Design a protein with these regions (language model features):
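A short, small-residue-rich loop immediately preceding and capping a beta-strand
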Residues: 112-114, 138-141, 182-185, 206-223, ...
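Helix-enriched interaction subdomains in cytosolic or periplasmic regions
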Residues: 382-390, 522-568
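Extended, hydrophobic alpha-helical segments in both membrane/secreted and soluble proteins
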Residues: 212, 216-229, 432, 444, ...
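Thiamine diphosphate
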Residues: 3-12, 155-191, 205-209, 230, ...
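N-terminal organelle-targeting presequences
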Residues: 29-99, 103, 110-111, 717-720
Length: 720
């Protein structure tokens, strides 16, 4: 028995019941969940592993090209409910388990159309760690959210993995509130060594013997905190293991038997095992003690011999870690289970004499199908939050992001002004900036995860009479706040801060939420703070920033998608500190900042149907405020509502302070209400769901307005 429809169809066949979403193509991925096989539209080509095909095509009706991809079985993974279930597996079974986990991640994440390529590099590493260690007694810290996906599957969260980054689902990062196996929360990266060192010191004070292992990525080695923590770990000589997962992009030769896919040779593997052996460690420590006892000259000679020997075993960079006090082991093929288990077992079984750094080399996107050019045919975004288009809704309308309009406007300005340069600390995440990089490669500087350096670097450029645009996501600018104050604002240098991904972060949750930038920039004495209401104003604010040469300026915009429309790429500079009236009403004035103008327009539409006409003011500037406009609105309205997608201490605070100091609230004829993000972290969900959770949607604004007017029953009906 079988029934098919092209829209929300139900297919019954034997004991299986199939459901699928509305389609614009006739290709789907099927996801087995119990006795159900669910469908979602597939936006990616078929992915294949190095050793197996992850799914096979099943036709529903021959000749119609209506089909789905059936997921392969995962017999070993189906038996794993916790890390303890790995303990009795052989190395061969561990390799099979890694293949099945990789299959699971590719299948489910492709279905969600979410970036996941980085997670495929750490599958074998997670398997080896949980096989050797006794988690959660032994602490495993991941400083990069995507690297922990296999870890999540192995620690009892497989059944919820399809809810990753969704409302009421599991987080895309490690979270202490989510699982006892997550020793520490990850978010911005580069924090795991510091946190792990703290745990190791606490362990030693308590007289415990558990292991502490931190996993860092090559991206986080760009951040200064990593080296501060390594230096302190070396100074304290504290026993802990740091694993540097160097994920590479280039496809490498495949060894089907061992599942190896790195350029590391057998000699390197053998030497790495020697490095991690007890006898080698003891001999080396004994030699250090003897040479120190024999005197300075002999000690220096031995150190040079030791450094030379280390050069035979590890890469040149190993000496940097050694100088920081870390005992270096590597490089290891991060996809070779046998080598990883061998090295980790040796380290776990011995009494360490200080911190150890294990260098593993892995491949980003391992297991994904390559095209004819050797490039992976899938989402190119990985690492931090991206601004790529979200296809999960099935929307295929022509659209662009705010970042696209920003980059195009900046290119247009740079063609006229050769002093304009771009400094970004986005690790290549903002793909829109690629057009600037291609057009002006010598004027484009991507510094990786080095926000502090980026800000001061841009400040130095100002001293050299350049016009730097410092492009940093809101949440990552927090890490460079000291530099923003001391190196830019205090010296009144005209760095132009383009604060991307501002506001709620949707699936990325509170870790990457850009909620605080309005508050922490608007309190700085010399900073001009502005935000566009739409893409047209964004183009104008780029032109405005170019025209400001005597003080710093910042403007924020979200990662959101807008319907693509043709705009003049050269904007018109705005008058500093001036807003605009969009709609004229009475009684209530909505003072909107940034893209919250759009929510106010929705509220205006809702309220007008209820016979309420409100004034909408597009304020544009948080600092300096349009004080004449505020005075006029206070004279003509009984209620003032400030609306912003930011936290306490931002736009609404500045407006209320001005009204209080100006005496506008003294007679009691004007009442003020703020609409802003609540004083709590908003968990991951879609942006629309987060707006409802935070109470800043158009309907919430309309309900607040009705409550001010005493129409509480109508306000409640809007919230149902």
């Amino acid at each position: 028995m079988m029934a098919v429809s092209c829209s929300g169809c139900t297919i019954s066949c034997g004991r299986l019941r199939f459901e699928r979403a509305k389609c614009c193509k006739h290709e789907f991925f099927g996801v087995l969940q119990g006795s159900n096989l669910e469908f979602l539209q597939c936006k990616y080509p078929l992915f294949t592993s190095s050793s197996r095909v992850l799914g096979h095509k099943v036709n529903v009706f021959p000749g119609i090209n209506d089909c789905f991809w059936e997921k392969h079985s995962t017999p070993l993974l189906d038996t794993i409910n916790s890390p303890q279930d790995l303990k009795n597996l052989s190395n061969k079974e561990l390799r099979q388990l890694a293949d099945e986990i990789r299959s699971e991640i590719i299948f489910l994440m492709s279905r969600a159309c979410a970036p996941f390529r980085v997670s495929l590099a750490s599958v074998e590493l997670a398997v080896a760690l949980h096989f050797v260690l006794n988690s959660p007694v032994d602490k495993i810290l991941w400083d990069f959210g995507e690297h922990s996906y296999a870890h999540k599957i192995l620690t009892g969260r497989r059944s919820k993995f399809h809810t990753l980054r969704q409302k009421d689902g599991i987080s895309g990062f490690t979270s202490r509130m989510e699982s006892k196996y997550d020793a520490f929360g990850s978010g911005h990266g580069c924090n795991s060594i510091s946190a792990g060192l703290g745990m190791a010191v606490a362990r030693d004070i308590d007289g415990k013997k558990n292991q502490v292992v931190t996993v860092i990525s090559k991206w986080t080695t760009m951040a200064g905190q990593v080296y501060e923590a390594m230096n302190d770990a070396g100074y304290l000589d504290c026993n802990m293991i740091v694993i540097l997962n160097e994920s590479r992009h280039s496809p490498l030769p495949i060894s089907e038997e061992a599942g190896s896919q790195t350029s590391l040779n057998p000699i390197s593997s053998t030497l790495t095992k020697i490095q991690s052996s007890k006898s080698f460690r003891r001999l080396r420590e004994a030699a250090k003690g003897v040479t120190k006892w024999m005197g300075k000259e002999v000690h220096e000679i031995a150190a040079k011999v030791d450094e030379y020997a280390r050069g035979l075993v590890g890469p040149a960079g190993a000496t940097l870690f050694e100088e920081l006090g870390m005992y270096y082991i590597g490089p290891i093929d991060g996809h070779n289970i046998d080598d990883m288990v061998s090295v980790l077992s040796e380290l776990a079984s011995m009494d360490l004499t200080g911190p150890v750094l294990v260098h593993v080399v892995t491949e980003v996107g391992r297991g994904l199908k390559m095209d004819s050019k050797g490039e992976e045919k899938n989402d190119k975004n990985e690492g931090r939050a991206t601004n790529s288009k979200d296809y999960s809704s099935g929307d295929t309308s022509p659209s662009k992001t705010y970042n696209d309009y920003f980059a195009e406007a900046l290119v247009a300005e740079a063609e006229l002004d050769p002093r304009i340069v771009v400094v970004t600390a986005g690790m290549g995440v903002d793909l829109s900036l690629g057009i600037f990089q291609q057009k002006f490669p010598e004027r484009f500087f991507d510094l990786g995860m080095a926000e502090q350096h980026a800000v001061t670097f841009a400040a130095g450029m100002c001293c050299g009479d350049l016009k730097p645009f410092c492009v940093i996501p809101s949440t990552f600018l927090q890490r460079a706040y000291d530099q923003v104050i001391e190196d830019v604002d205090l010296q009144n240098l005209p760095v132009r801060f383009a604060i991307t991904n501002a506001g709620l972060a949707g699936p990325n949750g509170p870790a990457l939420c850009g909620a605080f930038d309005i508050a922490f920039t608007s309190c700085l004495p010399n900073m001009i703070v502005m935000a566009p209401s739409d893409e047209d104003e964004l183009v104008n604010m780029v032109a405005t920033a170019v025209s400001i040469n005597d003080q710093p300026v910042c403007f924020r915009f979200p990662r959101g998608i807008v319907f693509a429309k043709e705009l003049p790429l050269l904007g018109t500079p705005l008058e500093i500190g001036k807003g605009d009236i969009l709609t004229k009403g009475k009684d209530v004035a909505l003072l909107a900042y940034g893209v919250m103008v759009q929510s106010c327009i929705i509220a205006h539409s809702v309220l007008s149907r209820l016979g309420v006409n409100v004034t909408i003011a597009n304020m544009r500037f948080c600092k300096p405020l349009d004080i004449e406009l505020i005075r006029m609105l206070c004279r003509e309205h009984s209620y003032i509502i400030t609306v912003e997608e930011g936290t306490i201490g931002g736009f609404g605070t500045h407006v209320s302070q001005f009204m209080a100091l100006d005496g506008l609230l003294d007679e009691g004829t004007v009442k003020w209400r703020p609409i802003l993000l609540p004083d709590k972290y908003i968990e991951h969900a879609s942006v629309k769901e987060q707006f409802d959770m935070a109470g800043i949607s158009g309907h919430h604004i309309a309900a607040t307005t009705l409550c001010l007017l005493g129409r509480n029953r109508e306000a409640l009906s809007l919230m149902r």
